[in-house]
Structure formats: structure tokens, C-alpha cells
UniProtKB/Swiss-Prot annotation:
It comes from Escherichia coli O157:H7. The gene is hldE. The modification N6-acetyllysine is found at K179. One of its GO terms (cellular component) is cytosol. Catalyzes the ADP transfer from ATP to D-glycero-beta-D-manno-heptose 1-phosphate, yielding ADP-D-glycero-beta-D-manno-heptose. Keywords: Acetylation, ATP-binding, Carbohydrate metabolism, Kinase, Lipopolysaccharide biosynthesis, Multifunctional enzyme, Nucleotide-binding, Nucleotidyltransferase, Transferase. ATP binds at N195, L196, S197, E198. Pathway: Nucleotide-sugar biosynthesis; ADP-L-glycero-beta-D-manno-heptose biosynthesis; ADP-L-glycero-beta-D-manno-heptose from D-glycero-beta-D-manno-heptose 7-phosphate: step 1/4; Nucleotide-sugar biosynthesis; ADP-L-glycero-beta-D-manno-heptose biosynthesis; ADP-L-glycero-beta-D-manno-heptose from D-glycero-beta-D-manno-heptose 7-phosphate: step 3/4; Bacterial outer membrane biogenesis; LPS core biosynthesis. This is Bifunctional protein HldE. The lineage of its organism: Bacteria, Pseudomonadati, Pseudomonadota, Gammaproteobacteria, Enterobacterales.
Length: 477
């Protein structure tokens, strides 16, 4: 199955926050100044790049989405340089000019790949009238699918609570990359995206994944958030939502050269994907893939649609993710050459719940690789009735592929996966429920090949059918 990228071209996103200009002076250094014990750098290259909230907007525009940027600047060369750089990459700027303040600028001097000094030109915009920012947000709300608030604690988001309320009143999701430990100011946001250090600065040190989930869910409740995404560097990212099982996604980075701006890429891809009409789980899947690309580049960078598609589909080359049947067979051959035990299971997995997550985690513990075969939409309809599936095949596979326990996801069109299992011949075939092993599709073929068949219990009280019934009852009530 081909994973389709979101329709970014129809996504409109506004970014509001602290914009800044990053300046870089490069050159060789071979002597010490006679005036002071400091190196002399002969500057031969000068670069200017949009930073802060401007980098978020660039990440959104690089995907082909419609990006609008609002922020505070001075009336100076830095503001003009920002406007030109952003216009060149199709970011529509609507800056509020503050004559009494300079545009925030960070100048870095580098030699031999080492940063020697950073000079900051800023006064902060605290106390500046926020009304022009509110007016720009109000004017855009009817034409955007997401609002990003990018906080670098420079003053542009001093009235962040009013901005959140404006967007929520209009039904526009609000995504915030937080700064500092006062999360009270972000109350009512749709999604916060702190990194692990920022998260632990608020909730305390977390020794286990369970503690991250427990404290994250409390934070969601305390501040009336809809969701929380904790980015965890080499450990990937964790999505927490009330009433849903936590979604832990392992990192997809192959090599890490520079984490600068990775958070901007994550929130930019999240916003663009949501604005394109995709689910939050799908948005996290694509954001995780994009982060894996951007940390492999030097400096603040963006991700193109081609790079993102290669990152998603490229997992097949490294033995992971959503695959075609042919790709899966090659991956299994490679796994067996490495001496790995292959476990396989199957199901509809329509509305993923805690029972599914627990079952798949237990299945994964039985071997080195876990294959999940998923009924196609037509197969599901024949099995479950005309009202199913609730979620289409592509969405079901993407969410499964994002789970840490799952290595490979493949679909099948038939009523049972018997043909598929016979072609893969896993070392262990697993099924959840009250089946007898001989009743499980593909069991005879696996046994004939010397493999094992095992039945695992599902977690009590978890059922897609019950979830659907509860939703229907809540609507009636």
C-alpha cells in the first residue's frame, strides 16, 4: 500500500510568535589578535536565515502549504531581510512594526565548524500593544485550518491566552511550542509540544515511560488541553490524549548531525497535516518522520514533500513501517539472515484502544520482529458490516506503523490472511481472543513449516464495538 502524503496544498496555517533573524559569519582563523587574546576571523561568507517563529513558517511553506506569519519587528535592515527571505519561500508576512525596538537578531561567528561567539541584538517586545496581533489573527481565522503559537519568550505572545480563546471560539486548533515552566498561560490549547527537558521542568524528572504518561495526563487535565506531544530526542515522541491509549513513536533518524530547529519542524508538520484534514495520530506520524530527516542536516533546515515521502516510504529499505506484500517478503528474508524471530498477527484494528496496544506489545515480546496484517476496507465491511470500518485502511495502517511494538504493517483483501501468512510463514503466528489454535487462519501452513501458533488474551473491558456504541449513546444523550 502506498502511503499518501496529506494534501498540503489545501492547508492554511497561521504562525504567530517571536520572529528573529539568524546571521552567520564564516571564515578561516589562523592567528590571535594583537589587541586581545581572541582569534581573528577573516570573514568570507555571510548567511541570513529566518529563525524562531519564522523558521516554523518556513517549514510549513516548504511542504507546499499556505503559511502566514505574524510577529513583531523593528523598522530596520533585519526586518527587511526577513521579509525578503520569507517571500522567496512563499511565506506571507504580516509583521507589526515597532519603531522603538530592533528586530531580534542573533549573529554567530564561526570558523572551522566551531562557533566562536554569538551576539544578540534585542530588547524584547514586552509591553507592546498586542491589539494589532489580535486583529491579524481574527482576520485570518476563517481561512486557516490551524494556528501555531511559537513562543521564545521575547514578548510577542504576552497575550497568548487571548489568542488561544480567539482561535478556540472560531473552532481553529491551536498548537503551541511552549517556553518556560508556566504552562498555565497555555490553558485551553489544543496541543502543546514540549521536549522532554521542558516537560520535566514542569512535572519533575520521569524515570519511566509510565511516569511520562501519568504526569502528562495530569498536565492535560490541569490545563484543559486536548492533547500533549512530548518529543524525546533519540527515544522518539509520545502522544497523550484523554480517553485514548498513549502513542509512543520511536525515532526515525538514521544519523543525527544537528538538532537545531527540529522542534520547529515537528510543530510545522503537525499544523500543516492537521490543516490538510488529517487526524492528530497521522500528523504525529508525519512529524516524526520529518524530524528524522531534519536532524540529519546541519543548521536550521526544512523538509520538502519529496524528503518526507522518502522518509515514510523509505522505512521499507531499513526494515520498518507500512509495506507492500513484496517489500515485506524481502524484509522478512533479511530478518531471518540476521537470526531474528518473526512474529505475525492480524486484525481490523479500526479504532485503536488500550487493549490493542497491550496485545501488540505482548506479541512483540515473543520475538524480534512483529508483522501486523490489516483487513482492507472491503474485507472489513464483509466481516463487520456496512458501517465499518470507521477509519479507512490507510489511516489504520499509519497509526499501527507508529507504534513502538510494530515493525511491519501490511494489508490483505481477502476475508482471512491465510494466503498472506502462507507466503510469509512467520516463526510464530499469534491471534488474540478465545480461538483454538487450529481455528486460526494460516495455522496449518505455519505448523507445516515448523513454526508455532499461539493465542493471547485481550485486555478485559476493551472493545471497538463498545467504543462505537458508547459514542452513539453519547450522541443520543
Amino acid at each position: 500500500m502506498k502511503v499518501t502524503l496529506p494534501e498540503f496544498e489545501r492547508a492554511g496555517v497561521m504562525v504567530v510568535g517571536d520572529v528573529m533573524l539568524d546571521r552567520y559569519w564564516y571564515g578561516p582563523s589562523s592567528r590571535i589578535s594583537p589587541e586581545a587574546p581572541v582569534p581573528v576571523v577573516k570573514v568570507n561568507t555571510i548567511e541570513e536565515r529566518p529563525g524562531g517563529a519564522a523558521n516554523v513558517a518556513m517549514n510549513i511553506a516548504s511542504l507546499g502549504a499556505n503559511a502566514r506569519l505574524v510577529g513583531l519587528t523593528g523598522i530596520d535592515d533585519a526586518a527587511r531581510a526577513l521579509s525578503k527571505s520569507l517571500a522567496d519561500v512563499n511565506v506571507k508576512c504580516d509583521f507589526v512594526s515597532v519603531p522603538t525596538h530592533p528586530t531580534i537578531t542573533k549573529l554567530r561567528v564561526l570558523s572551522r565548524n566551531q562557533q566562536l561567539i554569538r551576539l544578540d541584538f534585542e530588547e524584547g517586545f514586552e509591553g507592546v500593544d498586542p491589539q494589532p496581533l489580535h486583529e491579524r489573527i481574527n482576520q485570518a481565522l476563517s481561512s486557516i485550518g490551524a494556528l501555531v503559537l511559537s513562543d521564545y519568550a521575547k514578548g510577542a505572545l504576552a497575550s497568548v491566552q487571548q489568542m488561544i480563546q480567539l482561535a478556540r471560539k472560531a473552532g481553529v486548533p491551536v498548537l503551541i511550542d511552549p517556553k518556560g515552566t508556566d504552562f498555565e498561560r497555555y490553558r485551553g490549547a489544543t496541543l502543546l509540544t514540549p521536549n522532554l527537558s521542558e516537560f520535566e521542568a514542569v512535572v519533575g524528572k520521569c524515570k519511566t515511560e509510565e511516569e511520562i504518561v501519568e504526569r502528562g495526563m495530569k498536565l492535560i487535565a490541569d490545563y484543559e488541553l486536548s492533547a500533549l506531544l512530548v518529543t524525546r530526542s533519540e527515544q522518539g515522541m509520545s502522544l497523550l490524549q484523554p480517553g485514548k491509549a498513549p502513542l509512543h513513536m520511536p525515532t526515525q533518524a538514521q544519523e543525527v548531525y544537528d538538532v537545531t530547529g527540529a522542534g520547529d519542524t515537528v510543530i510545522g508538520v503537525l499544523a500543516a497535516t492537521l490543516a490538510a484534514g488529517n487526524s492528530l495520530e497521522e500528523a504525529c506520524f508525519f512529524a516524526n518522520a520529518a524530524a528524522g530527516v531534519v536532524v540529519g542536516k546541519l543548521g536550521t533546515s526544512t523538509v520538502s514533500p519529496i524528503e518526507l515521502e522518502n522518509a515514510v516510504r523509505g522505512r521499507a529499505d531499513t526494515g520498518f513501517g507500512v509495506m507492500t506484500e513484496e517489500e515485506l517478503k524481502l524484509a522478512v528474508v533479511a530478518a531471518r539472515k540476521r537470526g531474528e524471530k518473526v512474529v505475525m498477527t492480524n486484525g481490523v484494528f479500526d479504532i485503536l484502544h488500550a487493549g490493542h496496544v497491550s496485545y501488540l506489545a505482548n506479541a512483540r515480546k515473543l520475538g524480534d520482529r512483529l508483522i501486523v496484517a490489516v483487513n482492507s476496507d472491503a474485507s472489513t465491511k464483509r466481516l463487520k458490516g456496512d458501517s465499518r470500518p470507521v477509519n479507512p485502511l490507510e489511516q489504520r495502517m499509519i497509526v499501527l506503523g507508529a507504534l513502538e511494538a510494530v515493525d511491519w504493517v501490511v494489508s490483505f483483501e481477502e476475508d482471512t490472511p491465510q494466503r498472506l501468512i502462507a507466503g510469509i510463514l512467520p516463526d510464530l503466528l499469534v491471534k488474540g481472543g478465545d480461538y483454538k489454535p487450529e481455528e486460526i487462519a494460516g495455522s496449518k501452513e505455519v505448523w507445516a513449516n515448523g513454526g508455532e501458533v499461539l493465542v493471547l488474551n485481550f485486555e478485559d473491558g476493551c472493545s471497538t464495538t463498545n467504543i462505537i456504541k458508547k459514542i452513539q449513546q453519547d450522541k443520543k444523550g
